[in-house]
Curated annotation (Swiss-Prot):
InterPro entries: Xyl_isomerase-like_sf (IPR036237), Xyl_isomerase-like_TIM-brl (IPR013022), XylA_actinobac (IPR013453), Xylose_isomerase (IPR001998). Belongs to the xylose isomerase family. Keywords: Carbohydrate metabolism, Cytoplasm, Isomerase, Magnesium, Metal-binding, Xylose metabolism. The lineage of its organism: Bacteria, Bacillati, Actinomycetota, Actinomycetes, Kitasatosporales. It comes from the Bacteria. Mg(2+) 2 binds at residues 217, 220, 255, 257. This is Xylose isomerase. It is found in: Cytoplasm. The gene is xylA. One of its GO terms (biological process) is D-xylose metabolic process. Binds 2 magnesium ions per subunit. The active site is at residues 54, 57. GO terms for molecular function: magnesium ion binding; xylose isomerase activity.
Length: 388
């Protein structure tokens, strides 16, 4: 298998990823700003499928209408020249100080109304550029102290906002769905809808739940100490994995945004195995930050590394699934039984079946080994390249 990516691999990057200048709370930028046109061209050369953007990534905040149209025109020309696509777009509702207390859940009503109009304006552009997914990350929706935010009222306002956006998209006839991106904390002390589970539960309360799914990010779920592949599996099970953000994270700490494959490599292996075996057809979107130690050559090396690592893990996961010893080990661990309904014969037959309870030998069942260690070591052998 070649580790050289092609557009058919559906790898995408946000303008804000490779465009991150290295500025953090403790230090200034270490790299110059990148022109979005340059970003499109370089990512196309690396084999990417598309780019994504916040409104302010493409059009500097406060631009006049004339300036806005000029930025969009140049961007379109770059897309046309390279064949790159825009599968997803989103709104920056976190950088400007006006959003210091949030956007859709800000205590100030006028800020909430402004946030909705800002979002709607970029939804129009997203649809114009062919995006099929609109991501919503509520990075400022939260609080640092208990009395500062009435969470129930805030969730009412969050629901109101998404219902209005769904109404707008429907009224305009846009072929666009929303993907809510959870995160437990940072920049706020506590963020609303902190995990995939919270977001999935929230979506079921919306007026048009079919329009909404999730955009889980590797590092965000791991910041909460959760198993990312398990969260993705539940999103797939619910039919709600509308988009995914791939990066790397090393445990429960600040949001590291490492290149994909860095950090928890075992989790990355199981994630790729899941996405590929489940037939996920959406973009493989990298939301990472090249370390501020890197110059621009390092930025592009980091982006290339994201794609290369995914392709290597894809190859290793496929070899794992095709290995006859692995298939035997899966049967020994009774994974085939887990795929069978527990009571396909119905409740009446279950209650009448003495072997299910009265005659069930609990001691014999308790003594059965599960053979998980053998299965896991086979996975490790494939991950580490010890098996072909």
């Amino acid at each position: 298998m070649s580790y050289q990516p092609t557009p058919e691999d559906r790898f995408t990057f946000g303008l804000w990823t490779v465009g991150w200048q290295g500025r953090d709370p403790f230090g200034d930028a270490t790299r110059r700003a990148l022109d979005p046109v340059e970003t499109v061209q370089r990512l196309a050369e690396l084999g990417a499928h598309g780019v994504t953007f916040h409104d302010d990534d493409l059009i500097p905040f406060g631009s006049s209408d004339t300036e806005r149209e000029s930025h969009i025109k140049r961007f379109r020309q770059a897309l046309d020249a390279t064949g790159m696509t825009v599968p997803m777009a989103t709104t920056n509702l976190f950088t400007h100080p006006v959003f210091k207390d949030g956007a859709f859940t800000a205590n100030d009503r006028d800020v909430r109304r402004y946030a909705l109009r800002k979002t709607i304006r970029n939804i129009d552009l997203a649809a114009e550029l062919g995006a099929k997914t609109y991501v919503a990350w509520g990075g400022r929706e939260g609080a640092e102290s208990g009395a500062a935010k009435d969470v129930r009222s805030a969730l009412d306002r969050m629901k109101e906002a998404f219902d209005l956006l769904g109404e707008y998209v429907t009224s305009q006839g846009y072929d666009l769905r929303f993907a809510i991106e959870p995160k437990p904390n940072e920049p706020r002390g506590d963020i609303l809808l902190p995990t995939v589970g919270h977001a999935l539960a929230f979506i079921e309360r919306l007026e048009r739940p079919e329009l909404y799914g999730v955009n889980p990010e590797v590092g965000h779920e791991q910041m909460a100490g959760l198993n990312f592949p398990h969260g993705i599996a539940q999103a797939l099970w619910a039919g709600k994995l509308f988009h995914i953000d791939l990066n790397g994270q090393s445990g429960i700490k600040y949001d590291q945004d490492l290149r994909f494959g860095a950090g928890d490599l075992r989790s990355a292996f199981w994630l790729v195995d899941l996405l590929e075996s489940a037939g996920y057809e959406g973009p493989r979107h990298f939301d990472f930050k090249p370390p501020r130690t890197e110059d621009l050559d390092g930025v592009w090396a980091s982006a290339a590394g994201c794609m290369r690592n995914y392709l290597i893990l894809k190859e290793r996961a496929a070899a794992f699934r095709a290995d006859p010893e692995v298939q035997a080990a899966l049967r020994a661990s009774r994974l085939d039984q887990l795929a069978q309904p527990t009571a396909a014969d119905g409740l009446e037959d279950l209650l009448a079946d003495r072997a299910a309870f009265e005659d069930f030998d609990v001691e014999a069942a308790a003594a059965r080994g599960m053979a998980f260690e053998r299965l896991d070591q086979l996975a490790m052998d494939h991950l580490l390249g010890a098996r072909g």
